[in-house]
C-alpha cells in the first residue's frame, strides 16, 4: 500500500512539526516571568495533541486528495514533484509565519495567536511602534530560517519515483476512504458531541502553561474571546 504509506508519512511529519514547535515556544517565552519544569514540557506536548491532530488533519488534505487520485491514475513523477513542492512551499511559509508570529507576539500580548492579529494587517505600524529595527530584522530572519528548514525537511519526504497504480484499486480506495473518515474524526476532535476547540487543551492554572498547548494554526481563525479563555472555563 504505497499510497497509504505516503499518507501516513505526511501525517506524522506534519504532526511532529506541531508537537516540536511547543518546546521552542516554551524555550523562547519561558524564564523568570514564566517558569516551567521539564515535566511541564511533556505535559504541554501531551495536552496539545488533540488540536495538533485536528490541525494536521486539515494540513494533510492536499496530499490525501492527490494520493486518492493516484490509486486510479498513474501520475508522472514531474507532476508529483511540482504538486508536492507547491504544497510543501505553501505549508512551510504559512507554518513558519504562524509559529514565529505566535512565539514573538506572546511575549507582548500574553496570549496565543488568534483573530486579533487581523486587526493589524491594515495598520501594521501600530503593532511595530515599540519594536526596534534590529529586533524586526531578527524576527524576519527567524521566519526565513524556519520556513527554509521546514521546506527542506518536507521536500526530503516527497515521492522520488512515480507512484504505481494499486493492483486492488477498489480495496485500496475503500481503505483510503476509511482513512478519510479517520482524518475527519481527528479534525472534528473525536466522536463526542463536542467538536475540536481551543479550550479542549487547557489543563493548568498557570496562565503560561494554560496557553502553551494551544496550536496557533488552529486558534488563528478564532475570535479573541475564544483565544483568551480563562483557566478551566472551556466547558
Where do the model's predicted regions map?
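Catalytic domains that recognize anionic headgroups
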Residues: 235
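Transmembrane and membrane-interface helices of multi-pass
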Residues: 2-229
